[in-house]
């Protein structure tokens, strides 16, 4: 894989219903630009990966463990390994950046989705 790429050239993969990601995998971590449809839900789940994230556009109600908060552009999260979490997306949808360590190898073979990136918008 090339060291330098444009996000529009990264394949979009289905992660959940209404949730798709463009992921770049390194040796030790995964960076994902995640597109969440309006009013979609990421059901409660947990994984071995530590996860950090940032809202780029839109709004979410995010629950990590026992903490719930409404987040909009600029909001961040930190999810330790194996902590249950879930997301409810606002009516305008959302774009977020997620970082996972170790790599999300389970995301490498997800079903492909054919559509143009929602972010960044063409100039």
Mark where each language-model region is:
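A short, N-terminal "cap"/entry segment at the start of jelly-roll beta-barrel domains
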Residues: 1-28, 32-33, 109-123
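Short, small/polar residue-rich loop motifs at catalytic or cofactor-binding pockets
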Residues: 28, 47-48
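Structural motif
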Residues: 30, 59-61, 68, 84, ...
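Conserved short histidine dyad/triad with adjacent acidic residue
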Residues: 32-46
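Conserved GNAT-family N-acetyltransferase fold
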Residues: 34, 53, 77
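Glycine- and acidic-residue-biased ligand/ion/polar-headgroup-sensing regions
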Residues: 49-60, 65
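Short acidic-glycine-tyrosine-enriched beta hairpin
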Residues: 67-81
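Ligand-binding loop in jelly-roll beta-barrel domains
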Residues: 81-106
